[in-house]
Amino acid sequence: MRERVTFIHNDYSLDPEALDNQDAGLLGPQIETVRQDKLTIPFGELPSELTDILQEYEALHIRWASPVKSETMDPFTSRISPGLHVYATPVLPSSCNPTKLCSWLQRFGPLDCSKPEAFTEFQQSTSTSPSFSFYEALEDLHSFITTSSQEFCPELDSVCNARLRSLLTASGLDLSFDKAANALVVSALWPLRPQTVAVPASSARRVEVGIFINDRSQPNMKENELGVAGVLSVLGDQKKPSPTIFTFPARHRRDGSVFTSKFLTPTGLHPTLQLSFNSNKLPSADGECAPYAFLTLPKTIFADRYQLGDELFLASKNLTALRYTTLPVDLEAPAYTTETWGSSILLGLAPPDPGTEKPWSVEIPLHLRYLKPSATGQVEIEIPYPAVFWACSSEEGTLESPFDRLHVGYDYLFPRDTVFWHANPQPENGSRLMNRVTVPVLDDDGVGSIRSGTAIAVAIGFAWVMWKLVSVMLKSDRAPAGVTKETKQKKSH
């Protein structure tokens, strides 16, 4: 087992002499920084309950992002929609039991994933086996922290409990298992804010700590590369932190543009999601770049792929094409009978000519499903902000780095050498990266009368149909007698 803790900051005044590498861990001053904790656990050291589940999967990736806006820095700039995302590739789909996985996932909170139909198939270019995805809105990690503390932390281990509780302020959490690596990688990210440099040592694992600043001054750096400079320390080693400087290719980059997301009013049952950008400036001069929006839509709302197949209609909304959608998507079923979690779509965006920098916007037509009745006749739902980025081609054969982040839902919809420049989401109001929409539903007070009226109407309709059938049968019974009498009269003449 090994652990790597990384601080990325812009405090050029930080003196390495202020870092104290003690037996108990590394201590330092408070600085404004982004922090990532990454723990790699070999398969053989995992709890048996978890290994029983993981052995059924070629790969399993769990991603959570906070709905609260936060700031970050390169290289930790990849974005996903707020909530819990699960991407699973079974070894043998026929023998995989999603109920076991769903049961384990309940430590994050009550999730509606018990049926296989709750998962949707998604594209995974690196595997010949079918892969499946699941999503559910998740406000925080409180339930996960409580359960994990009971399972993994001894009662008197204050360090273990404190580190788990610190996840309450994390902006993201990733759990990744890959059968080829035969290990579970757990990483948590804390946003840019004042934090004290404090990392406890451990006798059970090797702990490395890196404290870096972004450094673009290094010679021979390429456009798609990032550089960092700082110090690296191995806890338990009484040596002073070692100076370190290096460059690496970056798959995810931070773009300078900002976007907001809101539903145009009035919404009705067919709301339009508007994405507004402060700039149409290209993020990179190297390679071809195009902007995209990757939407995660819960079962209460969906996009009509047939409507988004009309090129003239798309052009009027500053869209280019529906590049991808998960399936199936039932276009008629109400939310309370829909078994799948929802759907994901990738939309190409059409910005103005980059020759003149200016703000711009796109409009995405969506459709609400019918919801259950409520006492007020209205139900409020939330839709997570999409991940919005420029996808730019590069000439690099690989973009792998110590800080690389894969399996975020949209990365495998592009070539492996694609660089993603992420636009920064800005809440329309408050600090939450969620769009609220009010859905008109049936009033609870009117349900009884509507049901009675429907029953009466059905009964009357049934009686009318039966009366018509009986009338036709009676007429058909009399007709042959009249015809016979008329035939006999003709023969007598």
UniProtKB/Swiss-Prot annotation:
Annotated glycosylation sites: 318, 429
Segments in the Cytoplasmic topological domain: 475-493
UniProt-listed SMART domains: PIG-X
Keywords attached to this entry: Endoplasmic reticulum, Glycoprotein, GPI-anchor biosynthesis, Membrane, Transmembrane, Transmembrane helix
Gene Ontology CC entries for this record: endoplasmic reticulum membrane; glycosylphosphatidylinositol-mannosyltransferase I complex
Taxonomy, superkingdom: Eukaryota
Biological process annotations from GO: GPI anchor biosynthetic process
Pathway(s) the chain acts in: Glycolipid biosynthesis; glycosylphosphatidylinositol-anchor biosynthesis
Bilayer-crossing regions: 454-474
MF-aspect GO terms: mannosyltransferase activity
Membrane topology: Single-pass type III membrane protein
Lumenal-side segments: 1-453
Record localization: Endoplasmic reticulum membrane
Family under the similarity heading: Belongs to the PIGX family.
Function: Required for proper folding and/or the stability of a subset of proteins in the endoplasmic reticulum. Component of glycosylphosphatidylinositol-mannosyltransferase 1 which transfers the first of the 4 mannoses in the GPI-anchor precursors during GPI-anchor biosynthesis. Probably acts by stabilizing the mannosyltransferase GPI14.
Designated name of the protein: Protein PBN1
Gene: PBN1
